């Protein structure tokens, strides 16, 4: 790791930084292909005020980041944030970058009426992610079942 300070910031509309982050996610999460939606779709996603994209940079290199969604409540006037993906290049892991990304999101949340942040992770073959989240200062861990209704792509969805 070079001696550059780690800079953490929102991407806003920087599509190049977003592509760099997606490339990191692709390698870390072993996506089948490094293939993404077209540029117009990704720009529209970045313009969505409920979609948050935060990157960590060392010098000019994107070394990690996270994507998250703001979810507004209908029970009270607060919101939650769901962390969709979080990843740091392998050579920068275990150096506080992931924790700094979480802390950046926490500070943003405190000043934007966000009541909580939550994230989920696969329980099988995902020991590193589980260990990482357990090292952060979370308030609770809940076992949750997820049910997915596949509507596009493989298989036929049955009517309920």
Enumerate the language-model features and the residues they cover:
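Conserved acetyl-CoA-binding loop-helix of GNAT-fold acetyltransferases
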Residues: 94-107, 135
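Conserved beta-strand in the GNAT
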Residues: 55, 61-70, 82, 87
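A short beta-loop-alpha structural element at the N-terminal edge
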Residues: 3-21
């Amino acid at each position: 790791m070079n001696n550059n300070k780690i800079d953490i910031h929102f991407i806003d509309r920087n599509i190049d930084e977003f592509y760099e982050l997606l490339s990191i996610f692709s390698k870390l999460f072993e996506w089948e292909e490094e293939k993404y939606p077209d540029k117009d779709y990704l720009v529209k996603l970045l313009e969505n005020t409920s979609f948050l994209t935060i990157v960590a940079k060392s010098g000019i290199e994107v070394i990690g980041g996270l994507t998250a969604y703001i979810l507004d409540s209908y029970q009270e006037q607060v919101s939650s944030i769901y962390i969709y993906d979080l990843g740091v290049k392998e050579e920068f892991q275990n150096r506080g970058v992931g924790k700094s990304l979480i802390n950046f999101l926490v500070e943003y949340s405190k000043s934007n009426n966000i009541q909580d942040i939550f994230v989920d992770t696969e329980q099988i073959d995902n020991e590193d992610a589980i260990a990482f989240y357990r090292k952060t200062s979370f308030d609770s861990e809940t076992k949750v079942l997820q049910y997915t209704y596949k509507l596009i792509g493989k298989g036929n969805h049955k009517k309920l």
